[in-house]
UniProtKB/Swiss-Prot annotation:
Domain of life: Archaea
Protein's recorded name: UPF0282 protein PYRAB09800
Gene3D superfamilies assigned to the protein according to its UniProt record, in alphabetical order: Ribonuclease Z/Hydroxyacylglutathione hydrolase-like
Organism whose genome encodes this protein: Pyrococcus abyssi (strain GE5 / Orsay)
UniProt-listed HAMAP family: UPF0282
InterPro entries assigned to the protein according to its UniProt record, in alphabetical order: RibonucZ/Hydroxyglut_hydro, UPF0173_UPF0282_UlaG_hydrolase, UPF0282_hydrls
């Protein structure tokens, strides 16, 4: 199994998009990307817009290599919608390129879903039905493709139990040699998600960590996240790749240091330093104005690699 992270906060955008290659088959997991429209009361900086364009191009590139596409839920940083979106770098043409002729394994569009995501799912399916090879609701199901299986969890909360953000499904891919779980936006802060991950005992766990940058609004997610992740560490031998929400916090590395085993971000999995642009949006706006700012080395290097 070849594992290729495509986009995430450590790569400058909101996403947890992943590509897997098993033999001749490509699997594209959560093919969406977005920017937070407001952070520190500021819109995305120019560097973030450039990073968004780079991430979008990468998702489109790997969509061409995929026969199977999975969608854990209907937030725009996890699927590409059929509309022109500035902060999603989306369009009807880009969506068609991703989904045409593909086997789509998707979160159930009507069950265990909140009002917002139900509307988004309906809009998605209205367009996808015309172009996809096949569409199946994935919740709690296992799909056998011969060389590998793809198994989906029951719906789990998007974050804490009772979250108003609805539900997500987690994805297990097993080719007989490697078991990888993509835990999406479970955020590792609800027991249902943790129990399922431990039961599946993956070799690699890819997950969005808790939204510690929102602790003032969502409570003690830091402590809950540390307890739950340490439980996964104690009860499995999984390699941890944790990114997404937690990397929107400037101090995410301090969170990692409190764990019994240090995770990698997507960037680190790829062998480069993390570049959490959103967390440093204030500094990026100052940089645009010609002011002197201090930025982590990972961001400095990332900025040099962006297109002009």
């Amino acid at each position: 199994m070849k594992i290729i992270p495509l986009a995430s906060e450590s790569l400058g955008v909101r996403s947890l998009a992943l590509f897997l290659r098993i033999g001749k088959v490509g699997i594209l997991i959560d093919p969406g990307v977005a920017l937070g429209p407001k952070r520190y009361s500021l819109p995305p900086a120019q560097a973030e817009m450039k990073a968004l364009a780079v991430a979008r191009e990468k998702i489109q590139e790997y969509a061409k290599k995929a026969q199977i596409v999975t969608i854990s839920h209907y937030h725009y940083d996890h699927h590409t919608p059929f509309f022109e979106g500035l902060y999603e770098s989306s369009s009807i043409e880009k969506a068609k390129e991703i989904y045409t002729g593909k086997i789509l394994l998707i979160k159930h569009p009507q069950e265990n879903i909140n009002h917002s995501q139900r509307k988004r799912a309906q809009e998605f399916l209205k367009n996808a039905r015309e172009i996809a090879r096949e569409i199946s609701s994935a919740d709690s199901k296992t799909f056998d493709f011969g060389e590998f299986i793809i198994e989906f969890s029951p719906p789990v909360p998007h974050g804490r139990e009772g979250s108003k953000l609805g539900y997500v499904v987690m994805t297990l891919v097993d080719d007989g040699k490697t078991r990888i779980v993509h835990a999406s936006d479970s955020q590792l802060i609800n027991d249902r998600a943790i129990d399922w991950i431990i039961e599946k005992n993956p070799d690699i766990l890819i997950a969005g960590g808790p939204p510690t940058y929102l602790s003032y609004r969502v409570g003690n997610v830091r402590e809950v996240g540390i307890k739950n992740i340490n439980r996964i560490i104690a009860e499995t031998n999984a390699k941890l790749v944790i990114d997404h929400h937690v990397v929107r916090d400037k101090n995410y590395e301090n969170f990692f240091q409190e764990l019994d085993k240090t995770p990698q971000t997507f960037a680190e999995f790829l062998g480069v330093k993390s570049a959490p642009l959103e967390a440093y949006r204030k500094e990026l706006h100052k940089l645009e104005k010609g002011e002197d700012v201090e930025l982590p080395k990972g961001i400095q290097k990332f900025l040099k690699g962006l297109p002009p």
